[in-house]
Design a protein with these regions (language model features):
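Short, structured motif recognition centered on aromatic/hydrophobic residues
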Residues: 2-6, 18, 30, 50-54
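Short amphipathic alpha-helical segments
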Residues: 14-39
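Short amphipathic alpha-helices within nucleic acid-binding modules
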Residues: 16-18, 59-71
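Short, flexible helix/strand-to-coil boundary loops that buttress conserved ligand/catalytic motifs
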Residues: 22, 67, 80
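Intrinsic, low-complexity N-terminal interaction/targeting segments
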Residues: 29, 65-67, 105
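Glycine-rich beta-strand-turn "strand-cap" elements at beta-sheet edges
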Residues: 32-52, 58, 75-113
Length: 113
């Protein structure tokens, strides 16, 4: 299993607008296509203006297919038009689960459904 972590730095004072746009438009589109939302966060201490979210995938092939479908979704494209101007920078990490954590993550994801 893999977990992708995405970190977006948004313009100072724009975190609330970013999250509102995501909740109203982006989240519905993502949840239609991406299999497992692990978490969605914003920073309060340390480096500020960060939005962090994590998504789990069974394998890289699943990730590629899901992201391609999401990218083609008109609702996702409409969301990007609203939120891209708020983003200063973006990072992405693709992490492979440690062997002993795979089953635990699967149970956590199943419990959250």
């Amino acid at each position: 299993m893999y977990v992708e972590e995405r970190v977006y730095t948004v313009l100072p004072g724009k975190g609330g607008e970013y999250l509102k746009n995501y909740e109203e438009i982006g989240m519905k589109a993502q949840l239609r296509h991406l299999p497992h939302m692990v978490g969605y966060y914003f920073t309060e201490v340390g480096q500020l203006n960060l939005i962090v979210h994590q998504w789990a995938y069974d394998d890289l092939n699943q990730r590629d297919k899901c992201r391609a479908a999401m990218t083609a979704d008109p609702d996702w494209q409409a969301y990007l038009v609203k939120n891209r101007p708020l983003i200063v920078s973006q990072e992405s990490r693709l992490m492979k689960c440690a062997p002993f954590f795979v089953e635990r993550l699967k149970k956590m994801l199943a419990a959250g459904k």
